UniProtKB/Swiss-Prot annotation:
Pathway: Amino-acid biosynthesis; L-methionine biosynthesis via de novo pathway; O-acetyl-L-homoserine from L-homoserine: step 1/1. Signal peptide: none annotated. The keyword Amino-acid biosynthesis applies. The keyword Calcium does not apply. The gene is metAA. GO terms for molecular function: homoserine O-acetyltransferase activity; homoserine O-succinyltransferase activity. It catalyses: L-homoserine + acetyl-CoA = O-acetyl-L-homoserine + CoA. It is an enzyme of class 2 (transferase). The record marks E111 as: Important for acyl-CoA specificity. Keywords: Acyltransferase, Amino-acid biosynthesis, Cytoplasm, Methionine biosynthesis, Transferase. It holds the Pfam family HTS. It is found in: Cytoplasm. This is Homoserine O-acetyltransferase.
Length: 302
């Protein structure tokens, strides 16, 4: 996919160096095709890193895609410059009248808070309600998945006794679902979270399908019956070294922090991360974009 991004977005140079096809607005304007419009609600603290990770996942399809980056107006990010936010981001008020083919809601490192304690919770609820009528399919990631399941279905999150941290094996349960088309029966996903969803409540909730699970990490992939809501409890978009960065960050605060499991190999005295999830992660995002967005979205929104 020639992903269509602003000329000066920091991710552009990184993705081009990785041989991922990107185009700027000038070239995209000359192509006479109907592009997809995807809005990304970026709740992660490192905005540029998350932008790059998600655009990398969406950069290998023949479709042209426009991206709109969104932040809550009721929260001021502390780890991204005001200049970057002003140039590349907008708020819900400026887009609420629009229709989008797809939406991605990222995770956020705020699991210790009850949903109602989150500063932008009411705004997020409004966005989630809006997505049901203004977006063809919404992909919720990690905390974003927990928030979406709680808001749409009343499924609560529960605190884990120990952080779920590492790269975990998952089993595909619903092999005929389009979202996992082409998957091996077993695949890997990084997880980094202190909470989980209430699986008993999930079992008793109609209109939701569990597509994959892990013996160690629990439920990973959930889809609504109409394919409009996709919930992903892990972080398949993560770079090879993202868990390593989080581990080193946490070690500075607590030297008893356990290292992520099933992730490092030892090379002498060094711990080297190994990426075992990239191929399936790319396929997951491509399947969502093709089958749940492109194949389902109207050519002209009414």
């Amino acid at each position: 996919m020639p992903i269509n991004i602003p000329v000066h977005l920091p991710a552009k140079q990184i993705l081009e160096s990785e041989n991922i096809f990107v185009m700027d607005e000038t070239r995209a304007f000359k192509q006479d095709i109907r592009p997809l419009n995807i809005v990304i609600l970026n709740l992660m603290p490192k905005k540029i890193q998350t932008e790059t990770q998600l655009l990398r996942m969406l950069g290998n399809s023949p479709l042209q895609v426009y991206f709109t980056f969104l932040i809550p107006s009721t929260h001021t990010p502390k780890n991204t410059s005001r200049e970057h936010l002003d140039e590349f981001y907008t708020t819900f008020e400026s887009i609420r009248h629009k229709k989008f083919d797809g939406m991605i809601i990222t995770g956020a490192p705020i699991e210790h808070l009850a949903f109602e304690e989150v500063s932008y919770w009411k705004e997020l609820q409004e966005i989630l309600d809006w997505s049901k009528t203004n977006v063809t399919s919404t992909l919720h990631i990690c905390w974003g998945a927990q928030a979406g399941l709680y808001h749409h279905y009343g499924i609560e999150k529960i605190k884990l006794a120990e952080k779920k941290f590492g790269v975990f094996e998952h089993l595909v349960k619903e092999k005929k679902e389009r979202l996992v088309r082409g998957f091996d029966e077993l695949y890997y996903v990084p997880h980094s979270r202190h909470t989980d969803i209430n699986t008993e409540q999930l079992k008793n909730t109609p209109n939701l399908k569990v597509l994959s699970v892990s013996e160690e990490a629990g439920v990973c992939l959930i889809v609504s019956d109409d394919d409009k809501q996709v919930f992903l409890t892990g972080h398949p978009e993560y770079d090879t070294d993202t868990l390593k960065q989080e581990y080193e960050r946490d070690l500075l605060k607590d030297d008893t922090v356990k290292k992520p499991v099933h992730y490092f190999i030892e090379d002498g005295d060094a711990l080297v991360p190994v990426n075992r999830w990239k191929a399936h992660a790319t396929l997951l995002f491509m399947n969502w974009l093709n089958y749940y967005v492109y194949q389902e979205t109207p050519y002209v929104w009414e």
